[in-house]
Amino acid sequence: MAALLGRDLLSLADLTPTELQELLQLATQLKSQQLKLRCNKVLGLLFSKASTRTRVSFTVAMYQLGGQVIDLNPNVTQVSRGEPVQDTARVLERYLDVLAIRTFEQQELATFAEYAKIPVINALTDLEHPCQILADLLTVQECFDSISGLTLTYVGDGNNVANSLMLGCALAGMNVRIATPSGYEPNPQVVAQAQAIADGKTEILLTNDPDLATKGASVLYTDVWASMGQEAEADDRFPIFQPYQISEQLLSLAEPNAIVLHCLPAHRGEEITEEVIEGSQSRVWQQAENRLHVQKALLASILGAE
């Protein structure tokens, strides 16, 4: 994918619909081993937040491409002692070929991208989680004949995953419904971005009614009710979000062949029941595996693997 060579991925809004489809196609080829690519490059991981799937999948993806990985713990770098982001960025660009960053503020990510001359990938911020949604879309594509025109319903907190889902679904030609409690809606600026991408061709619905949002959906999706950094709010959020749990009752309102997704980690008995996450319609483990394949495709495209 020459179009992504040397580029940042800070948001799914950085992609065109064609680039998204080509990225998913490449991920499919790499997953099936129809295509094997190699690149002798170095990936840096700079993660200020805890990570299991993102850290491991990026590391394995880079190793499988023949590259190397350096895990940069911010707590043992000069970043933790107040070194300006722009200084760190201009140093790291001289050692690394690509940098994946997991941090709180989207602006910090943007500053790294502004000052580093190497590609920067958003490995999660409080605003967006683009790599997760690439895996989600690949999973949906694997489960249905055509992704275009399907309806995905997300119930829960209007967080970074909800924000990126709106953008990803709009790019993929999917309808997306976001059901949240009042006051917990997705970021208004991201909503506007997604609406501009959809351009009236697909539905973007925000509602406080999970039943309404779920009726007729082909994909039912949720995430934790309190994201990283919001742990102190968890007890207060529980009664507010309880009606937004994915249960067998809520799932029964979706299409009979609907699938259930969760980006993990899951709090069983809170945002999703044990019966649903372990049930026949759950595709959560397939979804988690696909983090590896889409991120391998992303790295291969950005680094020009051959």
Curated annotation (Swiss-Prot):
Reversibly catalyzes the transfer of the carbamoyl group from carbamoyl phosphate (CP) to the N(epsilon) atom of ornithine (ORN) to produce L-citrulline. The keyword Cytoplasm applies. It is found in: Cytoplasm. It comes from the Bacteria. GO terms for molecular function: amino acid binding; ornithine carbamoyltransferase activity. It comes from Nostoc sp. (strain PCC 7120 / SAG 25.82 / UTEX 2576). Pathway: Amino-acid biosynthesis; L-arginine biosynthesis; L-arginine from L-ornithine and carbamoyl phosphate: step 1/3. It catalyses: carbamoyl phosphate + L-ornithine = L-citrulline + phosphate + H(+). This is Ornithine carbamoyltransferase. Carbamoyl phosphate binds at residues 51-54, 78, 102, 129-132, 263-264, 291. L-ornithine binds at residues 160, 223, 227-228. Gene3D superfamilies: Aspartate/ornithine carbamoyltransferase. Keywords: Amino-acid biosynthesis, Arginine biosynthesis, Cytoplasm, Transferase. The lineage of its organism: Bacteria, Bacillati, Cyanobacteriota, Cyanophyceae, Nostocales. The keyword Amino-acid biosynthesis applies. The gene is argF. InterPro entries: Asp/Orn_carbamoyltranf_P-bd (IPR006132), Asp/Orn_carbamoylTrfase (IPR006130), Asp/Orn_carbamoylTrfase_sf (IPR036901), Asp_carbamoyltransf_Asp/Orn-bd (IPR006131), Orn/put_carbamltrans (IPR002292), OTCase_ArgI (IPR024904). GO terms for biological process: arginine biosynthetic process via ornithine; citrulline biosynthetic process; L-arginine biosynthetic process. Its EC number is 2.1.3.3.
